[in-house]
A protein has these predicted regions:
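Long, charge-rich, low-complexity alpha-helical segments
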Residues: 37-96
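Acidic, low-complexity/disordered tracts enriched in E/D and polar residues
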Residues: 1-50
Length: 96
């Protein structure tokens, strides 16, 4: 993956084509479903995805909201959010 393809704070993130965010009521779990694969999300991954993919602003704005919501240092939130989003992009679950 080239450095130019990395998701940064200026990016606008969306679920990749064919990927759906679904809740399994029986198991009480949220997951990303894609053709022939799925990824179960923990609470933090779900919060990040909701903040970044449902927002009208960029990833930086989502980081600001998450840092305020969780009363955490912005730098730590930014590092975690960008690492997660780039991992999900590498696996084909999100795009920018």
């Amino acid at each position: 993956v080239s450095a130019a393809a990395l998701i940064d704070e200026a990016a606008r993130v969306r679920l990749a084509a064919g990927v759906m965010l679904r809740h399994d009521r029986r198991r009480g779990q949220w997951m990303l479903m894609a053709p022939e694969r799925l990824l179960v999300l923990d609470d933090m991954a779900l919060a990040v995805l909701r903040a970044c993919t449902g927002a009208e602003d960029d990833v930086g704005g989502a980081i600001d909201r998450l840092a305020a919501e969780y009363d955490a240092p912005r730098g730590e939130i930014a590092a975690d959010v960008l690492a997660l989003l780039n991992d999900l992009r590498n696996k084909g679950y999100v795009a920018a």
